[in-house]
Amino acid sequence: MLIPCWDSAGQIHHLEGFPTSFKDWSRGEELSAQRREFLSAVEKVTPSSISSTRDLAVDMNLTLEVTLDDGQVLVVRQCYPSQNDDVEELWRTSKFESEVNLMQWLEQNSRIPVPSIHSVMRRGTDSPAHFIIMSKLPGQVLMNSHSLLSSLAKVFALSHLTVRNTVLELFRLDVPQRIGTTIPSNPGDGLDVRPKIGKQYSLSADRVFDTLEEYMRHLFSLKRKSKSIGDGDTDKARAYSTLTTLEDLVNVHLKSLTSPSLRRCVLMHDDLHDANILVDIHGNITGVLDWEFHSIQPAVLAVGYPAWLSYDDTNDPRFASSSVWWVVGRQESIELRRQYAMIVKVKDLEYYEALVAGLFLRSVVNWLIDEHADPGCLRLRGWMISEEALGESLTQPDQIVPAK
């Protein structure tokens, strides 16, 4: 399916959207020994045999849509085992267990449309890998559907995302007031906190953080160790200088965030992009997927504009990696962001205040966790220079200044 995408010059192209399937299989067709072993393990916990599969995702996890002989359609998500790396295996297992627990907790404690988990299997005698079997939710991924929605439906999708389904409910759920990734509480049916699981095991935290200041110091430390800043002495020296300047600015900014409502810890989906949201033709949000990366963070970091509307920081066309594309044009993104800000301002003033107050800090975090190559932090430095010129407009969501 071709969808409109914009390049850094603002030119529109029609590119392949998120695949509806990477590979289809039906009974009678050839299977690898590894896939045959895995499907046999799945069939041990399904009510009937598997007649066909579709590979929905194949990168960090294997996600299959399976059709059974009795007509049921389910989703199976396999956690790939690590290849002889105990540290990576612990990371993979930890995010699998955390995702399972959080999805079950959200189904019991919220109205957020997460898939219902039918079965959980761990690697062992009966299974070659950890996997879960879930219900299949209706709808299409927003990445493929957004351009097909009417202007009214796009605004309705923002309203539905905030008010009825995800964002504002996450903002108000009762969660522990420490910074990290969730684990089951013991005893009880609540949540506890473990060190934050990163999108790569090398980016995970080694402890739980009590304050926003501690967490920001951790992120700066990770960036200084990141391969993205370059390997040479010159690149590292330039990067360290830029990061020190930015950290000094952040420390000053943190002193202005005095309201307890801005520092209250909030549950957030760390990967809430347009391929992890399902919508119908009217803009109703029908599913929120892929909770393996989530965290509890201060409100100023946990809130934000929808990721697919971003032309900021690492998505600013002047400084973005060459691999970045945009699924919404700049002018439309400005209008939809304005609508989003208006919606949350009416529905939850504290959310809106965190949205405004945290705009600069969230941009900094996006740069610190970005793993695209940036030797010497030259892209980051260019953004810092441009942001200084914007002045007070950094914190005004209704006055978004487009890039020149």
Curated annotation (Swiss-Prot):
Q: What is this protein called?
A: Clavilactone A biosynthesis cluster protein Y
Going by the entry's taxonomy, the superkingdom of the source organism is recorded as Eukaryota
The record, for InterPro entries, names: AGP_Transferase, Aminoglycoside_PTrfase, Kinase-like_dom_sf
Q: What role is this protein assigned?
A: Part of the gene cluster that mediates the biosynthesis of clavilactone A, a meroterpenoid that features a unique benzo-fused ten-membered carbocyclic ring unit with an alpha,beta-epoxy-gamma-lactone moiety, forming an intriguing 10/5/3 tricyclic nested skeleton. ClaR, ClaS and ClaT are sufficient to produce clavilactone A and the function of claY, if any, has still to be identified. The biosynthesis begins with the prenyltransferase claS that transfers geranyl pyrophosphate (GPP) to hydroquinone to produces geranylhydroquinon.
Q: Which SUPFAM superfamilies does its entry note? A: Protein kinase-like (PK-like)
Q: Which Pfam families match?
A: APH
